[in-house]
Each structure stands twice: as C-alpha cells, then as structure tokens.
Amino acid sequence: VTTTYDWVQQGTVRAELEAAEARTLAPWAARSARSAGRGQPEPEDPVRTCWMRDLDRIIFSRAMMRAHGKTQSFIPAFSGEGPAAGRQGGPYIGDHYVTRATHMQQTARIAATLAQALALNVPLASAIATGHDLGHACFGHGGEAALQQVAPGGFDHARQGARLLTLLEPRNLTAEVLDGIARHSWKHDPPSTLEGMCARLADRIAYLTADLTDALRAGVLAGVADVPAEVRRVLGDNPTDMIGVLVEDVIRHSRGRPHVAQGDACAEVMTTMRSFMFERVYLRPEAERQTERAKRLLTDLYGHYLEHPDTMPMGASLAEDPVEQQAVDAIAGMTDRYALAAWKAAFALHAV
C-alpha cells in the first residue's frame, strides 16, 4: 500500500509541480527541473521545487531578520523634523515607514504578480525579489555611499547580497536566484532570466511608490499635487493607483512575448518621477545632512575596525579575508540601531 508519506518521500509532490510548470508556463519561462543547480549539490526536496526552497531559505535567513532594522530611505534613528516635529533633526515618520524588509516584501509581491500574469516562474521571481536587497548597508543611501567611499574597489549592494548568501551566511541557493540578486540593479547587465527582469522592474515600481508614500506621511511633500502633473496624468493621484498602472503596463507590453518590459509612456514618466524624487526627497538638504551623518558614522567605524579588528562582531566576515574586507562585511550586515550602538561603544560617545 502506498501512503501519502511514501509519495512525499519519493518526490511525487515536487515532480507534479515540475510537470505543471512544463504544461502551463510560457516557452521562455524558467523551469525548475532545468535549473543550473547549486554550488554544493544536495538531494532534491520531496515537496518543493528548487526555487520554492530558495525562497524559504531567504525568508528564514538571519540576513532577512536584520533587514527589518535597516533603513530604506528615511532614517528612524535620525528622525524628528517636519510638521509633526520632534527634536532629533530629521523627518518624523513614526512607526509606519518602509524598511529594507518591507521593501523586499512589496517587491516580491509585485514580481509575483508580473510573473503569474506573464506565465513565468512565480517562485523564482519571488525568491529573487525577496532577497534582492539583502546586501544593502544600514542607513539607506548614506550607508552605501560610505562603503563605496572606503571599501577597496568600491561597494555594490547587489554583489554584496550574492556574496552574503554564498559565503558569509551561505544558503546554497541556485544559480538563477544568485544571478537575479547580483544583477537586479539597473547599472548591471540584465539578469539571465525573465523572472529576474520581473524582480528588477518590481524593485523600481516598489521603491518609488513606497518612498513617495513615506515622503507624504513625513510631510516632506505637502501633498500629491507636488508630484509632476505629467506623472499624475499617466499614473494617477496616489501611490496605490500608480502601482496598479505600472504593473498593468508591464503586463500589456510583455504578455505573450519573450521579454519583460514597460511601454514608452510609463518608462518616461517613471524617469520623470525618479528625477523628482531625487530632487525633492532623496537629495533635499535635510536628507543630505542625514546622509553625511551616516557616512561619517560608518567611516569612523570602518577606521576603528581597521585599527582594532578584534572589536568587529564575530561571524560577520571571513577570517581569511583582508581586514578591509572584513570591516566592509561587518558594517554592511549591521542594522541602523546596531551600527549606532557600535559607533557609540567604539568612541565612548552618546550622540552623532
């Protein structure tokens, strides 16, 4: 008698999922049965495809836990300025702001919607999108700018994410997921899969609309009327509408075709919106001051670790690497709160 347990142990569930992919996905979609595999071969999971397994490994990682404490754009540790003004020198954003973790969750949902509508591999798109920003430093743009300045050879959060998941906190992910994470940024060549392109487009849709929401909530923008008229004319008058319009545009211009792309009109207004967000939000004077504070804090901490490598957090880097790389890995893995506490401990101070 064959029991349900026997079916599970024999991999019947996974095999059925792989067969469903072969029947239902577009010819150009990635198929888990054809994955290029993992760095370290291991037995297949009996009930999950390889990319379902990767998604779970990313969600359950320590890096994902820390991502909840990393800034996306607004730095809670420096909050305080704005219509609801506090006293600490930054926009007051309360508890409802986007962190790296919530940004990755939102990106993953958008990527999954795109992949589903385009008959692509949803678990692969979800895994890439869920882990795409794990390599980001604390303090948002300021943290990355600091590490770019001090790290030998510069710092790239996309490459750092792949390094993190391969070497520092190895999850033995598939080649396709690591490729999508390492190449999700628009400054890199496109990822090797269309599912990676879903994650890349979803990232931009998610961060622009979420950062707009945070800017409105913090009072950095007086209202949606501040957004350029041409953007509102195409995308609508609130961030939720904007997400829907942008997602439907990608589907309309990609469905039934071996590519994932936007239409010209939406691509143009996204460029306009991105320029607007840099001018009015990311590079506004207060944001620049916060960025400089973050850069100074992390630059100080980097120098301290070069002089006192024994004070670096244990397990955050590889002992065989040069001390400069160890310091970069240690700092890149920190949450905002941990970095601030480490700086205070290193310099016996209580304010930045």
Question: What do these predicted ranges mean?
Answer:
Residues S126-G131, G135, L201-A202:
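Short alpha-helix carrying the canonical HExxH Zn2+-binding catalytic motif
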Residues Q106:
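Conserved N-terminal alpha-helix of the aminotransferase class I/II PLP-enzyme fold
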Residues L134-F139, A206:
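Short active-site segment of divalent metal-dependent hydrolases/proteases
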